[in-house]
Swiss-Prot record:
A zinc finger (C2H2-type) spans 207-228, 234-257. It comes from the Eukaryota. It is found in: Nucleus. This is Putative zinc finger protein R05D3.3. The keyword DNA-binding applies. It comes from Caenorhabditis elegans.
Length: 421
C-alpha cells in the first residue's frame, strides 16, 4: 500500500509537469509616451542598418567602361569605333590615386542661367564718352558683349534666351586711344652711318688691327695681338714647343710625350706683356670707333657736292693718323709685323682693306728711345696714303663670321713668316 506521503509527492510532481507544458502568454500593455524606445523595441522588429553603396573609383569605372564597350559590340554597334575607344582608354597612364573614391557628378546648370551670368559679367565694360561728337553712337548705358567687342554682331545670337537685351554697338564705335605718331626718323630704316656707329661700340664682327692694318675678327683680337708680340708663355719641358694657351701644350704632352715621365708644362706669364695685349686690343676698337664717328661728322658737316666722298674720307683719315700715327708697344722686345694667316688674308681682300695693299706692305718698324729712361721700345709707324669709303666700312662691320680666324699658322706659312722676319 502506498503511504500518504508518497501519494502526496506524486500529485505535486504531476502538477509541476502540467505547469511546464502550458504555454506562457505575455499580456500586451498599452503604449505609453514615457517609454517610446522600449515600446518600439517590443512592438516592431529592428530594421537592418542602411548599407552604403560600393564606393566608385578609377578601376571600377574602367571595368564598367570596358563592359559597356563589350555590350555595345554585342548590340550590333560599330566594332571599329569601339576598338578605337578601347585603345584610347588603354593608352591613358594609370593615375597615382586610382583607388580613391570618386564623388558624384553634379548636374550642369541650365544654359540660360549661364548666359545671364555671362552677360552680367560683360556689362562691366562700358563705353566712355568721346570728345568728338559721334552721329551713329548709341546710348552710353548700352552694354558691350563679347561678340560686339570682336566685331561679330552680324552673326545671329541665341534667339530664345536674350530677346529682351538692347542692341549693342559695334566694336568700331568704341572709343580707341590714338597712338602717338612716331617721328619719321624713328619709323624709317636705320641709316648706314647709324649701323656703323652701333657696330663700333661692340656689335661689329671685325676691327682694324693697329699693327698690321688688316681686318681681324673682333672676338680673336687678343689672340691676334699676342701673335704679333710673339707671346707664348706656356712651354713644354721636353722640347721647344710653346703656345699662348695651356690647352695646346697639354694636348702636345699627351700626344707627343705619351708615357714619358717628368714631362710637364712650364709657365712664364709676363704681366707687362698681358697688359700690353689688352691695351692694344682696346686700341683696335678705339680706332675703329673713331673712324666711324669722324666719317659721320664729316658726312653730316662740311662735305661739299663737288668733291668726291672717297677723297674727303682720305683727308679725314690722314688728319686722324697725324694725331696718332705711331703705335708704341711697351715691354716687348720682338714684334712680328705680319701674322701669317691665309683665311684672314682672303677676308681682308674681300673687305678691300681700309688701307691700301701697297701701304700695308710698306709698314716699317723702328726703335724709339724713351727720353727719360733711355730704354728702347718697339713701335709701328703707319705710312700715309690709304683710301677708305663708306661701302668698305659697311662690308667690314657686316661681314659674316663664316671664315674662321685661326691665328695658328700652317707649316708652309711658318716658313714664309721666318723668311720675312
Amino acid at each position: 500500500m502506498e503511504s500518504p506521503n508518497m501519494r502526496k509527492r506524486l500529485i505535486e510532481m504531476e502538477s509541476s509537469l502540467e505547469v511546464k507544458k502550458t504555454a506562457t502568454t505575455v499580456k500586451q500593455e498599452p503604449l505609453e509616451t514615457s517609454s517610446p524606445l522600449l515600446a518600439s523595441m517590443i512592438s516592431t522588429a529592428p530594421n537592418p542598418p542602411p548599407t552604403s553603396p560600393h564606393a566608385l573609383n578609377y578601376l571600377t569605372l574602367l571595368a564598367a567602361f570596358r563592359q559597356f564597350l563589350h555590350g555595345y559590340i554585342q548590340a550590333g554597334g560599330d566594332e571599329n569605333l569601339a576598338n578605337t575607344l578601347g585603345n584610347y582608354v588603354a593608352a591613358l597612364p594609370m593615375p597615382p590615386n586610382s583607388l580613391n573614391p570618386i564623388g558624384p557628378l553634379n548636374a550642369p546648370k541650365s544654359p540660360f542661367k549661364q548666359q545671364q551670368k555671362f552677360h552680367s559679367i560683360i556689362k562691366a565694360v562700358k563705353r566712355e564718352p568721346v570728345s568728338e561728337p559721334a552721329q551713329n553712337a548709341g546710348s552710353g548705358d548700352s552694354s558691350v558683349t563679347l561678340s560686339s567687342a570682336l566685331g561679330e554682331d552680324a552673326v545671329p545670337q541665341n534667339r530664345g534666351s536674350c530677346t529682351s537685351m538692347k542692341p549693342v554697338p559695334r566694336f568700331v564705335m568704341l572709343p580707341v586711344v590714338a597712338a602717338q605718331s612716331a617721328s619719321p626718323s624713328a619709323s624709317g630704316p636705320t641709316s648706314e652711318i647709324q649701323q656703323l656707329r652701333e657696330a663700333a661700340f661692340g656689335r661689329y664682327k671685325n676691327v682694324l688691327c693697329v699693327i698690321c692694318n688688316e681686318w681681324i675678327c673682333s672676338r680673336n683680337r687678343k689672340n691676334h695681338i699676342e701673335a704679333h708680340l710673339n707671346y707664348r708663355p706656356y712651354k713644354c719641358s721636353a722640347c721647344s714647343y710653346a703656345r699662348r694657351r695651356e690647352i695646346f701644350v697639354d694636348q702636345h704632352i699627351r700626344t707627343q710625350h705619351k708615357g714619358v715621365e717628368g714631362v710637364v708644362m712650364l709657365s712664364d706669364v709676363d704681366l707687362h706683356v698681358a697688359m700690353e695685349v689688352d691695351r692694344l686690343a682696346e686700341e683696335c676698337v678705339t680706332r675703329t670707333r673713331k673712324i666711324i664717328d669722324t666719317m659721320q661728322e664729316k658726312k653730316d658737316g662740311d662735305f661739299g657736292e663737288n668733291k668726291d666722298f672717297d677723297e674727303k674720307a682720305l683727308q679725314m683719315m690722314l688728319a686722324e693718323e697725324a694725331e696718332n700715327k705711331v703705335v708704341v708697344i711697351e715691354s716687348v722686345s720682338q714684334v712680328r709685323p705680319k701674322v701669317a694667316n691665309y683665311h684672314r688674308r682672303q677676308r681682308t681682300k674681300v673687305l678691300k682693306k681700309i688701307y691700301d695693299t701697297d701701304v700695308a706692305k710698306q709698314t716699317e718698324l723702328k726703335i724709339v728711345k724713351d727720353e727719360e729712361g733711355g730704354v728702347p721700345t718697339m713701335s709701328i709707324k703707319l705710312e700715309e696714303g690709304f683710301e677708305i669709303n663708306l661701302e668698305d666700312l659697311m662690308k667690314m662691320v657686316g661681314a659674316g663670321s663664316s671664315i674662321t680666324d685661326s691665328n695658328e699658322p700652317g707649316p708652309s706659312e711658318i716658313k714664309k713668316e721666318l723668311a720675312e722676319v
